[in-house]
UniProtKB/Swiss-Prot annotation:
It comes from the Bacteria. Keywords: S-adenosyl-L-methionine, Transferase. It catalyses: prephenate + S-adenosyl-L-methionine = carboxy-S-adenosyl-L-methionine + 3-phenylpyruvate + H2O. Pfam families: Methyltransf_25 (PF13649). Belongs to the class I-like SAM-binding methyltransferase superfamily. Cx-SAM synthase family. This is Carboxy-S-adenosyl-L-methionine synthase. InterPro entries: CmoA, Methyltransf_25, SAM-dependent_MTases_sf. One of its GO terms (biological process) is tRNA wobble uridine modification. Catalyzes the conversion of S-adenosyl-L-methionine (SAM) to carboxy-S-adenosyl-L-methionine (Cx-SAM).
Length: 247
């Protein structure tokens, strides 16, 4: 059962850096729905992409799976046999709940839930990889290497879904979309104190990139095609395709 996010409703004397701990995991579904515009749309459409891209006898990776929402969306939409989903997160609290969540829904496609660092996971025989609001928590210098590894592990015709919070090279646009996101959180019941305290905790651990920077990295990794397929304010998702025809 998800609880309402009230973690930052009272003043916190010493704000540390953000961590996906037990307290966050407990309220995460409520938190992300009220904080990330378009999140539920992205989750459902990841399932639509899975229906199109997942191939028989291949693997799907959900890197930074949190509670498994994207994993479940993918699994509901796989139409082939002998597929496997590998869901990875480095938060013990998230992984514990993810396992329970996935076990509650029965489906023919097996899911392996792995507690570990996504940088250490071997990607192989993949028809689809999902990075759903995950890359932004890696050090910027480490992001290219992960994308390179994903490209190499994808089969021809495979797809990467990359969802992120964006920064903008046009400062005026960036300010507008930042303020729209602020209004979105306020409309969803967050107070100014809650918004401010959460932002202070995230600012050192969630470092955002522009869409142009993401596309540049994807090209460098080898992806022949990439495009923004969803955006709401300063949040969105890209799909990157590896050339070739799926076997």
């Amino acid at each position: 059962m998800s609880h309402r996010d009230t973690l930052f409703s009272a003043p916190i004397a010493r704000l540390g850096d953000w961590t996906f701990d037990e307290r966050v995991a407990e309220v995460f579904p409520d938190m992300i729905q009220r904080s990330v515009p378009g999140y539920s749309n992205i989750i459902s459409m990841i399932g639509m992409l899975a229906e199109r891209f997942v191939q028989p006898n291949t693997q799907v990776y959900d890197l930074g799976c949190s509670l498994g929402a994207a994993t479940l969306s993918v699994r509901r939409n796989i139409r082939h046999e002998h597929c496997r989903i590998i869901a990875v997160d480095n938060s013990p609290a998230m992984i514990e709940r993810c396992r329970r969540h996935i076990d509650a829904y029965k489906a023919p496609t097996p899911v392996e839930v792995v507690e570990g660092d996504i940088r250490d996971i071997t990607i192989e025989n993949a028809s689809m990889v999902v990075l759903n609001f995950t890359l932004q928590f890696l050090e910027p210098a480490e992001r290219q290497a992960l994308l390179d590894k994903i490209y190499l592990g994808l089969n021809p015709g495979g797809a990467l879904v990359l969802s992120e919070k964006f920064s903008f090279e046009d400062a005026k646009v960036g300010e507008l979309l930042f303020n729209m996101h602020h209004d979105f959180k306020r409309a969803n019941g967050y107070s100014e104190l809650e918004i401010s305290q959460k932002r202070s905790m995230l600012e050192n651990v969630m470092l955002t990139d522009s869409v142009e920077t993401h596309k540049s990295r994807l090209r460098k990794a080898g992806f022949e095609h990439s495009e923004l397929w969803f955006q709401c304010f300063n949040f969105g998702s890209l799909v990157a395709l590896k050339a070739g025809v799926a076997a």
